[in-house]
Design a protein with these regions (language model features):
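Alpha-helical scaffold domains
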Residues: 1-174
Length: 174
């Protein structure tokens, strides 16, 4: 309890409230070091994720931490209250496909493609009524294009995978 009080007092004095709230949650929910890295990488600030941090997470995809990494990614991707969470998850997923455990990440993306397609219609208005979801929608479209280009999955096959019919990545003769 004293460590939580200390984090709170530091956040008030330094003005880093969001970061320190994240640290409090990390302690409260007993997140592993890898889970904390994913939370940091996909945090709700406007900065792009650190490449060094993404490299560490990519290494984690080759370990028993894989499922906890992906659990946080999918949870944050579905968050409709923070545009930065969804955007950074897409950045991280693209990075993990290139630098992480490709087969495992690919399988996760294929199984959760409907979540990524859902983000193509992401909409969030700020306090002034301005839609701040545009960048997320664009990134989702670019991610799907990247995914199709890298994995020879056509638009029809992507829809089939999203519907769960297992039609992704076939020979595609036509």
């Amino acid at each position: 309890m004293d460590s939580m009080r200390k984090v709170y007092q530091e956040s008030v004095s330094t003005g880093n409230m969001k970061r320190n709230i994240r640290e409090l949650k990390n302690k409260m929910y007993a997140y592993s070091e890898m889970e904390q890295m994913v939370r940091e990488c996909t945090c709700n600030d406007a900065q792009t994720p650190s490449e060094m941090l993404m490299k560490e997470i990519a290494k984690g995809t080759f370990t028993v931490e894989f499922s906890s990494i992906m659990t946080i990614v999918w949870k944050r991707l579905k968050d409709k209250t923070n545009e930065h969470h969804a955007f950074k998850c897409l950045v991280l997923l693209e990075f993990l496909l290139q630098h992480g455990n490709h087969e495992m990440v690919l399988s996760q993306v294929q199984n959760n493609l409907h979540h990524i397609q859902g983000v193509t219609s992401f909409s969030l208005k700020n306090a002034n009524g301005i839609d701040v979801g545009h960048d997320v929608r664009e990134k989702a479209h670019r991610f799907l294009k990247f995914f199709r280009d890298q994995h020879s999955v056509g638009p029809v096959d992507v829809a089939a995978v999203a519907l769960g019919s297992g039609g992704g990545g076939g020979s595609g003769g036509g």
